[in-house]
């Protein structure tokens, strides 16, 4: 395990794993919660997120990254900054849960993604519902989705659902076993 990946894993274990009954965004109940906003919005951990996810997706060709607000927003920003630090141009975008009823009435915010190759990201994935919603929205906006990447996969079917439903590769940096969770 390289230093950056190991450092991020330790940050997640120390700051983001919360034990106790919780209801997840998927509606499922769990005995633990991985609150990755404690990582993706943390000044020490967020840069590690960007580096780890760029390394994880290094073989995919994309020039924009984003996903469904809110979980994906700081992940995309971390990747944008990590890419810039490496001398690479990478734009970020935000997918709203619904199009705005005013202004430009856009569902996908940020630089134009029509005709571009994009990576959809998420902080943690349970059923794959949020990334699939984002994939559908960015395809409607005219982008080509090259993959989906998440920081933590809960090993509850997201990988299979995304690969079958969206027809794109699914990557994750850590699984629940690496976090010591059942």
From Swiss-Prot:
Database matches in InterPro entries: OPRT, Or_phspho_trans_dom, PRibTrfase_dom, PRTase-like
Amino-acid positions noted as binding 5-phospho-alpha-D-ribose 1-diphosphate in the UniProt annotation, renumbered to this chain: 96-97, 100, 102, 122-130
CDD domains in the record: PRTases_typeI (cd06223)
Cofactor (UniProt): Mg(2+)
Residue sites binding orotate per the record: 126, 154
Keywords: Glycosyltransferase, Magnesium, Pyrimidine biosynthesis, Transferase
One annotated GO molecular function: orotate phosphoribosyltransferase activity
GO biological process, one term: 'de novo' UMP biosynthetic process
Keyword flag Transmembrane: no
Catalyzed chemical reaction(s): orotidine 5'-phosphate + diphosphate = orotate + 5-phospho-alpha-D-ribose 1-diphosphate
Class of the enzyme per the UniProt entry, highest EC level: transferase
Record pathway: Pyrimidine metabolism; UMP biosynthesis via de novo pathway; UMP from orotate: step 1/2
EC id: 2.4.2.10
UniProt cross-references to PANTHER family, sorted A to Z: OROTATE PHOSPHORIBOSYLTRANSFERASE (PTHR19278), URIDINE 5'-MONOPHOSPHATE SYNTHASE (PTHR19278:SF9)
Primary role: Catalyzes the transfer of a ribosyl phosphate group from 5-phosphoribose 1-diphosphate to orotate, leading to the formation of orotidine monophosphate (OMP).
UniProt record similarity statement: Belongs to the purine/pyrimidine phosphoribosyltransferase family. PyrE subfamily.
Quaternary structure note: Homodimer.
Record-given protein name: Orotate phosphoribosyltransferase
Species: Streptomyces avermitilis (strain ATCC 31267 / DSM 46492 / JCM 5070 / NBRC 14893 / NCIMB 12804 / NRRL 8165 / MA-4680)
Classification lineage: Bacteria, Bacillati, Actinomycetota, Actinomycetes, Kitasatosporales
